[in-house]
Each structure stands twice: as structure tokens, then as C-alpha cells.
Amino acid sequence: MTNIHHHKILILDFGSQYTQLIARRVREIGVYCELWAWDVTEEQIREFNPTGIILSGGPESTTEANSPRATEYVFNAGVPVLGICYGMQTMAMQLGGLTETSTHREFGYAEVSLQNPTALFADLNDDLTACDPKLDVWMSHGDKVTRLPDNFQITGMTSTCPIAAMSDESRRFYCVQFHPEVTHTKCGQKLLQNFVVDICGCETNWTAENIIEDAVARIKAQVGDDEVILGLSGGVDSSVTALLLHRAIGKNLHCVFVDNGLLRLNEGDQVMEMFGDKFGLNIIRVEAEDRFLEALKGIDEPEAKRKTIGKVFVDVFDDEAKKLTDVKWLAQGTIYPDVIESAASKTGKAHVIKSHHNVGGLPDYMKLGLVEPLRELFKDEVRKIGLALGLPAEMLNRHPFPGPGLGVRVLGEIKKEYCDLLRKADAIFIEELHKADWYYKVSQAFGVFLPVKSVGVMGDGRKYDWVISLRAVETIDFMTAHWANLPYDLLGKISNRIINEVNGISRVVYDISGKPPATIEWE
């Protein structure tokens, strides 16, 4: 079996908003990498034994006292090191160079003129004018290197940054002031490939097939002949987790699907058909709509609704788990960004982002071991694994659906009537987006039930019914988003269908709020 962790890159995070992008780009090249906080120790790096190290960008200034620095071992480990933006500046400072706060900051597009030859820029060239090779790059920096460390040479410059790239070829130390990980840097992926494959000598073994083989082997080694329980939601992460476990241990996997009444139209039946009938998984379906709706009565505050939904899920899951007396392990669809956000970092620092609405809060007395086969994977990698395992692309590429489901898309108190109306309206919206070839052009689309009534006219009579808001956004990272400029005729068709086909809806509106200031979800 291929050792997919034999060659690996360590990325030290100095706080850049792009750091996870670096990791994803390295993985796309076909090489395993991990992202750690910048202040890891020499002992931790030795234990990880990286084939190469990348120092990320960051918001701090190297000219400030007590600004972050890499441990000195980074430069004594005998492996190639690539410094990006702040990573370049701290490498320069730590190796005897000098940085200063620039009077002319560079943010956005820049053109780097290549200078002395370097292995990092081998076969890179975006423009060639009068034998002057140049790169189109993306800059985001205030400080700049003004004096080279010993044995370094300038390999790139811009009109305002005389040292935009530098290298010490003998020690295989490379620095760029720009961000190769962002798509705006045209040759960025090739640059990273030069570093990871050609300079570090990494083999590209990080492929979907190898990851599946490795995950199945590790599951078998971890759980043996024991039985495992998994909360299957039908989402991407739990679905791929289920198929990996099923391939490894077969009927020793018990999936619990909790139908809480807050799912999309026919979603419960679709989950059972897909995983029970098609893939032959052992699934227990728990019809818990009444239990959830009863617990949510009278609750209209969003965070209180989230907590209630999470608590009831744990209670329902716990009740089912008690019936499976031979279960020794709990499986979860934890993915790598969850690990990063939960600060399961090598330094032990905790940065709690928000609680997850899954089985992470199971009672301590259950005493189950934890199986997390996706723990090393980014979301795009999970989708690739899912495709290789036979999951349909349309399911893997569905728009995000919140953990609390319709609980945060029905504003205010949750009632069955409201959920049923929203389910039907949302299904029409999504169906028409597919028909018009707009579904995959937007990043997320859904309906929101507004608990206000509006006067309408149907035939010769007036009616006083509910309002649905449609929301569609375009985004790269979901940190910021633009509302999608859907064609008026498409919006008109969707509105007409909802009002005519969903008895109880008299008005449809379209949300044209960006993020910020609005969030993508209404609650």
C-alpha cells in the first residue's frame, strides 16, 4: 500500500486569511501537508519530520517588537523553506536581513520582473517583453525587505519593491513577497509545484484512490471487528464517512438517520433510498418530527433554536445508541477545517469558532471511542473521495444546508405548517434554478419563511397569506458574498409558480443584501 504521508509539507500559519489556501494548493499538487500555528517547537517539527516547510503570510509587522517568529530550527532542519509575504519578511529578519515599513504599500495586482535564476521560478513566465521575463502576481503587504541576508540573491522585483523575491539556492531557502496561493497570481500553482515537487522532492501520492485505500486500512486497524455507530444526515461529510466505514467494516456499521422535520422536501426518503437501497448500508430511521417541534414550541430566538435542536438531536441519538449494546465506537464526519477552527493545534491553543450541530456533544457515560476518517481532508477533497466511492455528483455538489436545517430558515417560532410551506417553495426555487442552468452558477440558494402575512388577490377574492423570501448568493469562501443577479424572467417564473402552487403563500420577495453587512443565512 502506498504511504501517502511519507512525503509531507509543514505550513506554519502566521495568521494570513489565505493560509488554508496554501494547504489546499499543496494537496491539489498531490502532496500531503498540515497547517500548524507559527509557534510550534523544535521537538514538534522533528516529530512531524517534514520534507519541506512553508511560512505563510500574516497581518503583523516584522518591525514591531514581539512580532511572530518561526523557531530557529526551521532554518536548521536541512529541508527547503518557502517564505510567503510575512513569511519572507520574518525569514529575512531571522537570517540577518532587514525589513522596513514601506511608504508605498502594495495591495492587488503587481508585475514582478524576474532577476537572477532560481529553481523556484523554473519555467515560469507570464509576459516576455524585450527579453525581460515577468510574472503577474497578487500583492498584499505593507512591510518590505530592504537588506538581503547573507548568501541571498534577488530573484524578483517590482517598480516599488526592489526585493520582491529572493533565494539562497545552496540552502534551498526561497522567499516571495506576493501570494502564489491565490488564483490572481497566474503561475502561482506552478511555482508551488516547483517548490513541493522539484525542490523538496515530494512524490505526488495524495490521490483519491490512495486516500481511500489508506482510510479503509486505518479504520480496520482501529476498530477491528467492533461495531460502530454514525449519525447520518445525508450531508456530504457524514455520507462519505458512512461509505468509507461501510467499505471497511460492512454490517458492523450502524447508521442512525434522525428525521427531525426540518429537512428539505422528500430528503428523508432520498437518504434512505440512496444509502439503504442503493449502497446497502445498515440504517435506522428515527421519525422525530413531533419531538423536535414540541421542544421548539414558543422559542423564537435564533441561538436558542439552534441549541434546542442540538440538544434534542443528542437525546434522540442517545436513545438509539442505548439500544445498540455492542457498539464500541462513534464515527463522525469531522474534516480538516473543523480541526483547524477547533484549534486542535500542535500548540494546544483553542480558538472556538462555534458549536457544531452533530454528535460532538454526546454524554460522557457512553464511553465510545472516536473514529474520524475525514479528519485530514478539506471539503473539496471529501467530494473527490465521495465521487470515487460512487456518490452522485449532484448530491456531492449540492449547496450548503445548515445543521439546524429549516430551523434557521423559518424566522421566529418553528411550526409544522411553516416548515411544510417553506419546503414546497424552496423545492420550486431549486427546481427552476436547475432548469435554467443557474443552480451551479450560484454558490447557495434557498427560501426563507417570513412569519408575516400579506394581502393578495386570487381570482375574484382577496387572501391574506404568508411571505417567502428567496436568497441566492455568489461567493468564493462564504466569508463575503454578493447577491446573485438572477434574470428577472426567471425570478418571475419562480414567484408565479410558488404563489400558484403553494397554497398559503401570497407574496414572494428576492433578497438583494450582500455579506457584509447581511449574513448569508437570515438567522
UniProtKB/Swiss-Prot annotation:
It catalyses: XMP + L-glutamine + ATP + H2O = GMP + L-glutamate + AMP + diphosphate + 2 H(+). It is an enzyme of class 6 (ligase). One of its GO terms (molecular function) is ATP binding. Coiled coil: none annotated. GO terms for cellular component: cytosol. The keyword Membrane does not apply. This is GMP synthase [glutamine-hydrolyzing]. It comes from Histophilus somni (strain 2336). The gene is guaA.
